[in-house]
């Protein structure tokens, strides 16, 4: 499977572009001086009057709550660092600080992580193919191949002839996902028929979990090629609606009146449009992903 590597910062920016119109973006300020992760006071370069006590500041992915403000010409703000489960980090002079953002980067990050841990493995299977053989795992039995802990299911097992190189489907294999840790540390393994020789090469196709590499907004994740925009579309739709909306609910989701929109605190029509776009792109992307389907082999009964 061909994949594309995306960064968390890139996905957050794309999600915010889906949520904000240009005129709706929060007011930016510039830090007047560098601050470290433990400092609780800060200044801004200009326009300090737009921020006051109880306002929320966002610097990078960190949220800071203003608890006090001096009356000077260039006021000093006292802030609560690492507000709302964010990490306090150092910031340089002239770093951009947003005042009262409606959609925070930390909230977008949680929506993206929800997509990759829940919906993505089901909607957009990430397929990994590896060449394996049982000779490497003789210590746990030559008919059992241990698998990594990120494997969700085995989709296909094929045999490659060592002489002709021909690849054919192998019958009689079984994916074991509840093995004792004393046998396989990950608890998962591939059991192959006894006809397989320890030196035979097996081409195993597996559906695996999405995994982040790195930390912070520099973390990267691989997604199937052609699906690069779907994580941001999903995160924007979840944040706009407050939860995931199923296809069945879309058929019944209508904005009956402005009174209903005011009561729910959201634009029902906009929510419907966002989820329609998510499912439309999912349908398009899934047509480009070839997922191997396990072949069903039935034992031939003599005399039947």
Regions found by a protein language model. Give the residues of each.
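Glycine-enriched, solvent-exposed interface loops adjoining structured elements
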Residues: 1-36, 48-64, 68-75, 87-304
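Short alpha-helix capping/helix-loop boundary micro-motifs
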Residues: 39-46, 83-84
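Catalytic Cys-His active-site segments of thiol-dependent hydrolases/isopeptidases
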Residues: 76-84
